[in-house]
Amino acid sequence: MAVGMLAGCGSKTNAPADNQVKEETPATEATAEPATEEAAGPEIPTELEHIKVAYMPNYASLATIVAAEGTGAFEKYGFDVELVEFADGPTIISAMESGSIDYAYIGTGAHKLCVQGRADVICFAQLSNADAVIGNTDMGVNTVEDLKGKKVAYSSGTSSEEILKATLGKANLTMDDIEAVEMDASAITTAMVSGKVDACATWSPNTLTIYNELGDKAVELGANKDFTDTNVSVSSFIAMPDKVKNDRDQVIRFVEAMYAGSDFRNTDFDQ
């Protein structure tokens, strides 16, 4: 808050011949600047707005959303939330473009579509370490080099593709050196466990299922932790560009709810 300050006092002039001293200029109080009001937050609607929020079936995607829901943050900011499950980020963005989803969580790979202008990142979710490339030793895959010429399942446009390319790079291999088998993220686990592919690139909880099912036959060839010096696996919450432009108050309220959920996660992790 601005505080009024006293102006400097006037000084005496040289005494005239009759030794009369001119009066000092009286001190004057400067006009106080008006207090600057804090910017008003978004207006909370009197009735809850129904919104659809897309997620993927893993901890990273759900943790903040569930925390926001469980602590009442969504209701506090005026939302009645319907959660809708998807297998991957690109599919989510396609659904958003059709108007069936309002907000969503995406992993690293789908950020390419944001760069292309198809969606806007509205807030940071977290850094991920859930992606991995897994080989099946029964299929002759023990090292990254063994992937050459092998069938490797991945999901295009997702963090699955990102971790696969990074892992191949460790052995100076590219996608052209393998038999890349593109498939829906939800189908990768079944293909890997059934032996239809020799290796795969996927994320949690698919990775956990594969390790449990294959046991000692599963070998990790690459993971996020191997590339922290060159790659960052970022997850974010997104909205459509038109919504960000035309419904800014609602977007801000959604972000506030997400950050409330994130704060709860950070301070009450055990819950």
Model-derived features: positions:
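Bacterial lipoprotein signal-peptidase II cleavage site
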Residues: M5-V21
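Short, glycine-/small- and polar/acidic-enriched structural segments
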Residues: E23, A30-D184, A191, D198-S204, ...
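Pocket-lining segment of extracytoplasmic ligand-binding domains
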Residues: T108-A110, V181, S186-Q271
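Short linear motifs in intrinsically disordered/low-complexity regions
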Residues: A15, N19-Q20, T137, K217, ...
